Regions:
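Alpha-helical transmembrane segments
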Residues: 14-22
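Hydrophobic single-pass membrane-insertion segments
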Residues: 21-36
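A surface/extracellular/periplasmic glyco- and lipid-processing/surface-interacting theme
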Residues: 2-9, 17, 34-104, 111-374
Length: 374
């Protein structure tokens, strides 16, 4: 009887052992595998734990940085530019400073047959820029299309209205004052009238902006489309030679761009004088020129100190002009759908204007006149 019981026990353990062996094999216990041999499964839960360091392995995600392909500016930069009003009265043009550091300069007609400019600076450390002058009502809209901080030394009444309408960040010397620890200062190396002695600098403007908590970054790109390759207009449809460009704003102010074939840049002259930085002696020059023919009128209800009606420019709309680079010019159209929108430049065939890598002067010129291009 006992022998029969032993046989039953043995058979029982054999059966149980077989079942356990089958299960262990099925579960890969003897296969040499482990859980890390299986493909990882994505974690579908939100885990806010900082796992940037696991053991000695750094698994911090990296964001690739793309080097800028442009030299005029870092195209990946989000630095907000400054748009600074520049005094172009002929007496003051001889003491101008800093314009060669601007990525763009816009030049507009104003009263008395003169012009006034906006110089745009981005990621620069220029300490002497000027001389600075007041705003007109059309100027702030062009600063706005760059999302720039607008810098001016006063404004006429319509200009103040435009600044209020746009709610644009601006720095006005009439409010901040000028002097030590101010965003503006005066310097008079040529013994000129006081209105021709106001300067600023990026260092001063940044210090002031930080003290006022101005937004210093932007996602807005300039309205120009830059080409990574050299723009050669010589064989383009409708292109003409452009070695000398003359804009006669009035009998008392004439502007000339002369092409330097060695540098492939245009050098500026005003009233037959070389236009240069008073403090460095460097000639103001440019790689690109854009001419915009615009409608010029007057503001009936406001006059300047001399009793002259302020000029007005029709900001929104469209018109014709020229893009000029490397010794050639080609006719273009410009379109600014609203006062607050960016200007779009196209050739007459509808294709997009791409400008050369370099600075650009944009000259707004009365459409009732003609720019001479030879």
């Amino acid at each position: 009887m006992k022998n029969k019981m032993y046989i039953v026990y043995i058979l029982f353990f054999v059966v149980i052992g077989g079942l356990l062996g089958y299960l262990l094999i099925d579960l890969d216990v003897f296969s040499g595998k482990n859980e890390n041999d299986n493909p990882p499964v994505a974690n579908t839960t939100t885990d806010k734990t900082d796992n940037s360091q696991i053991g000695n392995i750094d698994v911090t995600p990296t964001t690739p940085t793309t080097p800028s392909k442009l030299t005029i500016m870092d195209e990946n930069s989000k630095t907000r530019p400054y748009a600074i009003m520049i005094n172009n009265y002929p007496a003051a043009m001889k003491v101008q400073a800093g314009l060669n550091d601007a990525y763009a300069v816009y030049e507009f007609p104003i009263e008395g047959g003169m012009s006034r400019s906006i110089a745009f600076f981005k990621d620069k450390t220029t300490t002497k820029i000027g001389t600075c002058r007041s705003a007109r009502q059309y100027h702030p809209y062009y600063a706005y299309e760059h999302d720039a901080i607008y810098v001016h030394w006063g404004s006429n009444h319509p200009g103040s209205d435009a600044i209020s309408d746009l709610k644009i960040t601006h720095i006005d010397a009439n409010s901040t004052g000028a002097g030590k620890n101010k965003p503006f200062y005066r310097e008079n190396p040529a013994k000129l009238a006081t209105e021709h002695t106001g300067y600023t600098g990026i260092d001063r403007l940044l210090t002031y902006s930080k003290s006022k908590n101005h937004r210093l970054t932007t996602d807005t790109k300039p309205p120009f489309k830059y080409s990574y390759e050299d723009v050669d207009l010589s064989s383009a449809s409708g292109a003409i030679k452009a070695n000398t460009i003359t804009l006669k704003y009035s009998g008392s102010y004439s502007l000339v761009y002369e092409y330097n074939s060695s540098t492939k840049r245009y050098e500026r002259k005003y009233n037959k004088k070389v236009h240069k930085d008073y403090f460095t002696g460097k000639v103001f020059d440019t790689k690109n020129i854009i001419i915009e023919y615009v409608k010029v009128g007057t503001v009936a209800e406001y006059k300047d100190a001399a009793g002259t009606n302020y000029l007005d420019i029709t900001v929104a709309g469209s018109g014709k002009g020229y893009y000029i680079t490397n010794g050639y010019a080609r006719e273009i159209t410009w379109t600014k759908e609203t006062k607050k929108s960016q200007t779009v430049y196209k050739y007459l065939d509808g294709s997009e204007v791409k400008i050369n890598d370099g600075n650009v002067y944009v000259n707004f010129f009365n459409k009732s006149k003609t720019v001479s291009i030879k």
